Amino acid sequence: DSIIDRKVRNMRMISPSNREVNISLDKVYGKTDNEYIGMCRREVMDAFMRNRAAELGANLVNGLVTKIETGNNRQGPYTLNYSDYSSGESKGESKTLEVDLIIGADGANSRVAKAMDAGDYNVAIAFQERIKLPEKEMNYYEDLAEMYVGTDVSPDFYGWVFPKYDHVAVGTGTMQKNQSLIKGLQV
């Protein structure tokens, strides 16, 4: 619960012809505190996951991966080459670390995936902004998320308004092959 900003219980989906479908979890599951769509901020989730990993024995390193050696037949053990910024200096110290397993949790344009030549895969690209609304408008989104479908917001994805801590996240996305089309929607 500590990472969840809002417990959304209502979803509105809006079609290209402006037809709306409203989904209420209360109508589906009855009024309960256990059924909701949890909204959280990425940085809060990341911090939670880092802290949880440390609690379970992981050694945290403030570093930037620069190269990954994948071992025989790309099956490991893996050698991470990285710049260690633990000292707080602006120039990291070059280090290596041998590991049995790598979890790349660094997003769609993953340095980790590129460094170990993970191959081509379909990637969705998202653009999102945080917008602070006046209290009245923010109250409207208290437990409501909206999704918009149609080529006016994305050729193959959707647009959204998701309520977060003290703002709404407004965004859209597309598959990487269409990113030039979606960039035309940016202001």
Task: Please annotate each region the language model reported.
Residues 2-48:
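A conserved beta-strand/loop capping segment in the N-terminal third of enzymes
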